[in-house]
Amino acid sequence: MKLKNNNRKGSFLESAFILTISTAFVKLAGLLFTIPISNMLGGEGMGYFYAAYDIYNMLAVLASAGLPVAVSRMISETLVAGNTDEAERIYKVSLRIFTIIGAVIAFAMFFGADVFAAIIKSPNSGMSIRVLAVTAFCAFVMSSLRGYFQGHSIMTYTAVSQVIEALSKLILGCALAYVLLRTELAYVGGSAGAIMGVSVGAVLSVTYLLISKRRFSKSEKPSGMPVRGDKAIIKELFRIAIPVSLGASVMSLVNLIDTTVIMRVLQDGLGYTYERANWLYGVFGNAKKIFNFPSAFIIPFTVSILPVLTAAYTAKDKDGVAKNLTNCFKYAMLLALPAGIGITILAEPIMHIIYFRTPDEANAGAPILAVFGIAVILYAVVTISGAILQSFGQVGKPLISLCVGGVIKCVLNAFLVGIASVNILGAPIATCVCYAVMTVMNLCFLKKYMTGCRAIVTNTLKIAGASVVMGVFAYLVCSPLSAMLSVRKGGLIAIILAAAVYALLVVLFKIITIKEIKSVLRKGKK
């Protein structure tokens, strides 16, 4: 059965294109935020900043994982049958439930900030955790709104809301950090100030989405079809959301445990002072921030593929399923493979380009970033395969791999960080092993759905070949350029040249054709 065309909805590539553009802007803004903030706060201030975010990510993971996925999937299935009335009911019920959950989480973060800070043995991060409470509440409200639009395969509103958040974080976050850093609060205040910009951005983003939803609903025509009751909708909502949220919660909990384990092992196991351990954790966080940059570009593919694949799978459109699976893996690997290889090879110059005012942190973070480069590739496969399994209704399978990977990560972290010659480098190594195990498990779960998708293997091998050639080229030109100029200037030129070589190889290997590029750009303009 073929799906009917709907002009109001975007295809997978159109949706992914829109979100990729917004993600590029958001990440650029994030990079412009990270550079001054990290140079202002240094290792100590960034240690407070990242510790607060680990707490936030654990408590607010529901908002960014299971809940929007559940809303998107339910609305997508409902719209296949043309029942717009039920789509509206799903939104209203989800908004009511998510608002209550968000309020509870925000309350816990605000009044329990000092307790959380003590648990992770970073007492000075309490103020930053408290400021993030507003962001947590807004995140839950946004999950319902974004899930609604994503279920319609309309990504423009989500994209604009992300840009609003990014601009507020960049402008207000930097300004407030600068001001508070110069008060008696020093690094503690500077970290909290940077996070205040994030909270204001979340409020503005929610406001924009609510206004957009009201305007969009006015153009929706009632279907007059039967609608399920609230209890049935809530039951279905949590049936889908709980496994996905548990999976995301596992990784957030693992990251929180990592924070605690790393800080405790460095202090109690290796005998480092709190200041030294916090500095090392700040360096680790800086490298992880760069790892998150290319990894974030995989999210548009997972968000876009879920409603499209769900609709095709529900309609039993085998050709549509195969086509979208192939495209999803192809475009995700086009980004992840060169990014991962490039980061591994050019880790040192990348650290010095971004953290140019803190050379000690840049030098210490380079080996960490090099290992994270491998994790970029594995993360892409894990994320894409997990989203595909969710689209097919296999929401419990990714949870299994997440739990196994999470346990392995915790055990390896405790062991590797405790080795004096390895210490903080053990954290990214454990991350790589974790994602490698999850990759193998997810691909095994997906095997029976991959019939008719042989092009995925062919495309991946071509992309890997182009990426390796690019990596060798980058390695050969970076050293002499750095010797002639400087690590930063030589590295920057090497990155630009390597990107140009990769783009040329992609066309020469016929991984992507000029016709495909023009098609995507034309759809993006629409």
Regions found by a protein language model. Give the residues of each.
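N-terminal membrane topogenesis motif
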Residues: 1-29, 85, 89, 226-251, ...
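Membrane-proximal transmembrane or re-entrant/amphipathic helices at the cytosolic face
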Residues: 2, 475-526
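Signature of the first transmembrane helix
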Residues: 11-72, 106, 110, 135-136, ...
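Interfacial/gating helices of multi-pass transporter permease domains
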Residues: 38-58, 187-192, 235-240, 263-291, ...
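Helix-loop junctions and terminal segments of transmembrane helices
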Residues: 65-80, 287, 295-319
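Interfacial segments at transmembrane-helix termini and the short loops linking adjacent helices
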Residues: 114-132, 326, 344-376
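Membrane-interface junctions at transmembrane-helix termini in multi-pass inner-membrane proteins
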Residues: 140-162, 374-404
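Membrane-interface helix-loop junctions in multi-pass transport and translocation proteins
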Residues: 156, 167-206, 396, 406-440, ...
